[in-house]
Amino acid sequence: MQKKYFGTDGIRGKVGNSLINAEFMLKLGWAVGRVLANSHSATVLIGKDTRISGYMIESALQAGLSAAGVNIKLTGPMPTPAIAYLTHSVRADAGIVISASHNHYPDNGVKFFNKDGFKLSDELELAIEKQIDKPMKTVVADRLGKAARMNEAHGRYIEFCKSTFPSNLTLKGLKIVVDCANGAAYAVAPSIFHELGAEVVAIADDPDGFNINQTCGATDTAHLQEMVVKHNADVGIAFDGDGDRLIMVDHHGLRVDGDELLCIMAIDRFYLKENAPLGVVGTIMSNLGLEHTLKRHHIAFERSPVGDRYVLDLMQQKGWFLGGESSGHIVDLGFTTTGDGVITALQILRIMQQAEKPLADLKKVMVKHPQVLINVPIKGILDIAQNPNIKKAITEAEKQLNGAGRILLRPSGTEPVIRVMVEGSDEGIVRQTAEMLAAAVQQSTL
């Protein structure tokens, strides 16, 4: 059955438009409460990033949950993976994160975790949607849910993250620039690296409700790259607005993406023979260099659709524990149930310390194929497969690549854009082909 409200990662949109308004969030909270409170008194954890609209959404969800008889624990600004961890740790029935991830402040959304810290199943999302479409009824007064602040949330998550780093190692001797994206990681990430011994230079760590992901964070690393060089740092770390993805920067100021980080982690595990990966899951956007490198090391590789939810689904089907996306969502089931930027960073820093090598050397294990990604804004829905102009452009693009590359056009699941990706052996041809396809998509939207 097709879902009416839920997208690929919860519910997301422009604040005040569509579903991201107080009225719908009130009803959503009530619907979630109805599903959870069918058989027992339930408790839900609510966290958020730093967007100004988080206050409104948090209050509306809280009221709806209470009206359904559900108790609420409020953590305030916390990374998405922290809510996944804490939901299971405190034995809550569900966790809710108010965030639009890497998007700017006018957007917001809501995503959910079950009691075990995993994203909700399709069946549970459909059950919630069914309740949304029913008339809202408030429980009697003595059954209303109570809300309380969870003041220990930051400390518990900080200690959990530190526990994933070997107790016989420290980060002493490392200078790290940490870009918090003016988002949910600002209050925890710098402390974690500092407490493990690193010299920390924190940037984009002063959120004001409007500056989340604004010329900072995992999707815009230019300032971080400059700061790593300026401070003569060993490494730079960039999170996105909700802290579930990671991009790093080596000491030369060069960006290291999710494919490269995933490759470093997989090969490290393979040689350690400790929790050696049976295989690694990437996505249809993962660089061919990742696939080829892993296969040279006899590590199986499979591709899922884009989205950490789909990565995790395929990991679970295969019985593998490591997977991720080029964008920096990396899931390591040895430690957590969802992408966690801090824990991924700690694993890379561990490898650096144990190998006594800089990130610039570690990333040499993978040779990336030239790849160009262009996001083309659209209005409404564009049927890529049936559009004659786009079909003609794809045919021409395939001729240009001459069988030595990949072409992918797909609508984003989180933004009104068509993503055009071209990959091949010749960077000039790849860029020319991508620009030609992007122009065809743009022309088709006029």
Swiss-Prot record:
One of its GO terms (molecular function) is phosphomannomutase activity. The keyword Magnesium applies. Catalyzes the conversion of glucosamine-6-phosphate to glucosamine-1-phosphate. InterPro entries: A-D-PHexomutase_a/b/a-I (IPR005844), A-D-PHexomutase_a/b/a-I/II/III (IPR016055), A-D-PHexomutase_a/b/a-II (IPR005845), A-D-PHexomutase_a/b/a-III (IPR005846), A-D-PHexomutase_C (IPR005843), A-D-PHexomutase_C_sf (IPR036900), Alpha-D-phosphohexomutase_SF (IPR005841), GlmM_bact (IPR006352). This is Phosphoglucosamine mutase. It is an enzyme of class 5 (isomerase). Its EC number is 5.4.2.10. Keywords: Isomerase, Magnesium, Metal-binding, Phosphoprotein. The keyword Cell inner membrane does not apply. It comes from Coxiella burnetii (strain RSA 493 / Nine Mile phase I). NCBIfam families: glmM, PRK10887.1. Belongs to the phosphohexose mutase family.
